Amino acid sequence: MNYDLTNPYEIARYIKESKKSTPLKVYVDGNLTNCNVNNIECYGENNFYVLFGESQEILNFLDENKDSINKYRIEQDRRNSAIPMLDTKNIDARIEPGAIIRDMVSIGKNAVIMMGAVINIGCEIGEGTMVDMNAVLGARAKLGKNVHLGAGAVVAGVLEPPSKSPCVIEDNVLIGANAVILEGVRVGKNSVVAAGSVVVEDIPENVVVAGSPAKIIKTVDDKTKDKTKLMDDLRK
């Protein structure tokens, strides 16, 4: 079934209707040679095995075959999860360990996603854009090309409370560390948001804003451009 990810109610419906998943990884010390694993993925031999599968099926298997098992250890990292993580194998971008990216996210060529970044469903990240450490992109947030989203910055999502207008960060915008862009705000091209700012309304192109709430303090000039220029080598 297709869902319109531009509509918060459609995203909510997708989450509601999705099959919830509690995957387990289990290390087993025992003889499973004659055990029926059914839909469980089973790898190993010589009394050591690794199992992958859904929680209830794994737990049933362990109980039914307890006489063949000496001991086991279970690893679990989620419970009743509605949305899988994004499959990043074929994405032409740099994605560092520890980034959390949900499915149905678009990431452009040569983008950089740093450790600890959290990117929710429906987000769009443009070519050459960097999402720095521990930054958060809420549902449906849109970042244009060559944006820098600073460490710890937040671009609010528009899933709950629902809104039809997502946050939009246009091309060549720099957002400083720990800044917050509130729901539905658009930041115009080439603008700069100072670190720690709270942006509560749309920002025009080519300006610098600072404060809480953020206010325009100057237009972007050559000095600003020099201080906020991006490094292409980080995107290779």
Curated annotation (Swiss-Prot):
Q: Which CDD domains match?
A: LbH_THP_succinylT
Keyword Transferase on entry: yes
Q: Which residues form a coiled coil?
A: none
**Key word Cell membrane present in the record?**
no
Q: Quote the EC number.
A: 2.3.1.89
InterPro entries recorded = DapH, DapH_N, Hexapep, Hexapep_transf_CS, Trans_hexapeptide_repeat, Trimer_LpxA-like_sf
Q: In which pathway does it act?
A: Amino-acid biosynthesis; L-lysine biosynthesis via DAP pathway; LL-2,6-diaminopimelate from (S)-tetrahydrodipicolinate (acetylase route): step 1/3
Q: Name one GO molecular function term.
A: tetrahydrodipicolinate N-acetyltransferase activity
Please write the reaction equations for the catalytic activity of this protein.
(S)-2,3,4,5-tetrahydrodipicolinate + acetyl-CoA + H2O = L-2-acetamido-6-oxoheptanedioate + CoA
Q: Which GO terms describe its biological process?
A: diaminopimelate biosynthetic process; lysine biosynthetic process via diaminopimelate
Keywords attached to this Swiss-Prot or TrEMBL record, sorted alphabetically, are: Acyltransferase, Amino-acid biosynthesis, Diaminopimelate biosynthesis, Lysine biosynthesis, Repeat, Transferase
Q: What does this protein do?
A: Catalyzes the transfer of an acetyl group from acetyl-CoA to tetrahydrodipicolinate.
Q: Which family does it belong to?
A: Belongs to the transferase hexapeptide repeat family. DapH subfamily.
Spell out the protein name for this chain. 2,3,4,5-tetrahydropyridine-2,6-dicarboxylate N-acetyltransferase
The taxonomy runs:
Bacteria, Bacillati, Bacillota, Clostridia, Eubacteriales
